[in-house]
Amino acid sequence: MQRHPMTKEGADALQEELQHLKKVERPAVSNAIAEAREHGDLKENAEYHAAREQQGLMEARIKQIESLLGSVQIIDVTKLNPNGKVVFGSTVTILNVDTEEEVTYKIVGEEEADIKHNKISVNSPIARALIAKEEGEEITVKAPSGNIEYEIVEIQYV
């Protein structure tokens, strides 16, 4: 079985979601199904069919999370000795050399990547260019619009 890297924060969030699904959502859906059953004929009972569909989706998500948690390798960046280099779990501030625009990214596993929250996958082009680099170094990222030059401004291990 292939192990997938994940930050401790990402694994904790998945564990929390799993507990919520099992302890809150699952009983609520079971109650909704029982309540819909009381309305009689199940063939034409839209509430019943909707609740069963919701149950199926929820159970699939529970299985997905359990499978994920069973195959992750949790990496706690605070326990690493990165020697000032960008590593998995680092939070990196970079400066676009052309536009002077600064952006901060946290390098995380595939399953926890979320660009809206500036969490990028370790397999993304930017993260691959950043890994093992130090503050002050410049990197080149190949983008559809051409190469983009960045300078590493700051590396944090939180």
From Swiss-Prot:
One of its GO terms (biological process) is regulation of DNA-templated transcription elongation. Gene3D superfamilies: Transcription elongation factor, GreA/GreB, C-terminal domain, Transcription elongation factor, GreA/GreB, N-terminal domain. GO terms for molecular function: DNA binding; RNA polymerase binding. The gene is greA. Pfam families: GreA_GreB, GreA_GreB_N. It comes from Hydrogenovibrio crunogenus (strain DSM 25203 / XCL-2) (Thiomicrospira crunogena). Disulfide bonds: none annotated. This is Transcription elongation factor GreA. Necessary for efficient RNA polymerase transcription elongation past template-encoded arresting sites. The arresting sites in DNA have the property of trapping a certain fraction of elongating RNA polymerases that pass through, resulting in locked ternary complexes. Cleavage of the nascent transcript by cleavage factors such as GreA or GreB allows the resumption of elongation from the new 3'terminus. GreA releases sequences of 2 to 3 nucleotides. Coiled coil: none annotated. Keywords: DNA-binding, Transcription, Transcription regulation. The keyword Repeat does not apply. Belongs to the GreA/GreB family.
